[in-house]
Amino acid sequence: MPRNVKKNPRDVTKLSGKPLAETIEPSPVLKTLQEGWVTSPDLIEGDLSFTLEVIQNMTVFLLANPNLNSSHLFRADILYDSLGVLSAPHAMEQSRDQGSGGRDQDTQKEDYVEPLPARSVPGFELKRTFVRRLIPRNRNLDRPLEQTCHFYEADELPPTSNSTNIAQSEQCESKAESPRQRFLVIYLPHVSSKEEMPWYHPLLRSLAFLYDFTPNAFPHSSEENKGTGIMSVHFLPYEEEPIQNRLERTLLALLSTHIRLARQTRLDEKPEGGNYNPHKDNVIPKHLVQDTYARLKLKYAADLCQNWVEDTEPTKHVFEDLSITAFLIELWRSMYGVVPADERSPDQKEQGKYDLKFPGFVDVACGNGVLVYVLLSEGYHGWGFDARRRKTWSIFPSSIQERLKEEIYIPKPFADVCTDSEMDFGVKTHTGMFPEHTFIISNHADELTVWTPLMAALSNPASPLPFISIPCCSHSLSGARYRYPPPKPNQKGSVDRPEDQEVEQNPQPAAGDLKALRAAKQKERTDTGAANSMYGSLTAKTVATAEEIGYEVEKTLLRIPSTRNMGVIGGRRRTTQEWTSRVHSAQASQAVGCSAPEAVRAAAQVLEWVAAVVQRECAREGGVEVAAKVWIERAKGLHKGQGKGNQPAH
């Protein structure tokens, strides 16, 4: 199906309709005797309402996110900021407490690139300089490109009037002008000839954006009438290089994208250059996941898609699982200091296929098994299980198939109240008692989503297992479809008890004023996972359940091709601290563990919390025994191939 075409943010009635080559004219700002800078009336858009701060904020945001301008690009890494605000990749890793994990220590040297000199622009003052590295999606087709970006500013006073005619002065009062504010950005690619220019970059020696803003002269202007602005594109072509149709389309698209993004820019909701969503790239820096994903995609995608045997379309599932795998590899690098097989030293490889520092993983409801296959192939030992065997398992090597189990999970609280005959499925069952420190992966596990933190805690109450849960379809603890009520605002970690099922309408803020109410409602609307959707409520329920039984929980938006892309991570920081102590402390057991009596008390507390959650959640269905019977019947259906196959795609 064709992609939805975004509405053009420009006033197309003012465009000439002629080819760009017929409308170019010298740039009044940048043209010199030595450099033939040009622009065009078709590359100018007026009557814009954006303040200078909005344009500057949007421009800085685009520095690290050029993928919004070109689908050929992943991102840009900021290598240099003259103000020291935006960080280079190695600095971002250090700020997130990333372990070196076997990374090349020369990375910091590679991140430094000398900026190209800034040209003098009459009337403008150089304010800031960046160097960025454009990262293509497919490095087999295109190479990364460094680019220097210079920011200039200028203030111009309006022309003075010598008229002493008071009546004329009063008549023109409504047209009074303030000093014009000007913001100029010049982009310089680090190439010595046009032959070195990658495909994704316009074939230009240099590119510039100019924004002129004239504030409203009256101080009490409304928010919508702060002034008017003009945005224009200027460029320095190569000599004797014709203006091709592709370049024309690119320049027009760049101008449209800048206008569209400026309309979406909010000055008070994000740090400079950062994401609007606080849950995006908040656990692992974007560049680490994207680089690993690109490597995995090149290594596995073609073979998996070519040999796909399921009835579903392969690319979506393959790319999604590779994206999640990339995130897990970088997550485990930061938690355990382990690296994929290709990065291990010869001494490490001699010790075996798997890194023994890694405690192992289990992929619950593993489905097609792609995630397990790639993780095992990358040198991380673990296994996966599902209620029924999938056709895809047959395409994997026998060593991988041995790690994919057709087993049914029966939660321990349910197994404790069921008879042996009720537990007889004709297939192996288990209660989720995994080895100590196992990392649990719950990827779109549906019935197991809310059970995931409970399963992790029950497996080792003295030291609950770390986990990641990526919610999808909403189910109660019995496995029946159930839509959880949205969480109450301003109650972090609260859970919906039976007596609290009714959600309060129009809650009042504690501060008691309209400003506080507006802020509370805005936060409620924008806080991912607190939305009133079924998915948002399920995510919030998973978080609340984990927090209630003692987990420190983090939410992060995963870069996967799915709308169900929220990752709920439990126990990451605690596990990272424990593993760091194990590696660096000569008295690891004393440094990491606690005394036996303390461990017993901690385990008893966790079990008490879990029991309270299970009893409360099952109460709506008649109690734990009734919920257990529902779970058993649904599990039998899943084993026969019913249920999940009829669920909508996500």
Swiss-Prot record:
Name of the protein in question: tRNA (uracil-O(2)-)-methyltransferase
Pfam families with a match to the protein in the record: AdoMet_MTase (PF07757)
Keyword Transcription regulation: no
Protein family per UniProt: Belongs to the TRM44 family.
Enzyme class: transferase
UniProt keyword list: Cytoplasm, Methyltransferase, S-adenosyl-L-methionine, Transferase, tRNA processing
Region (Disordered): 1-20, 91-112, 481-513
Organism of origin: Aspergillus fumigatus (strain ATCC MYA-4609 / CBS 101355 / FGSC A1100 / Af293)
Catalytic activity: uridine(44) in tRNA(Ser) + S-adenosyl-L-methionine = 2'-O-methyluridine(44) in tRNA(Ser) + S-adenosyl-L-homocysteine + H(+)
Regions of compositional bias (Basic and acidic residues) in chain numbering: 103-112
Main location group: cytoplasm
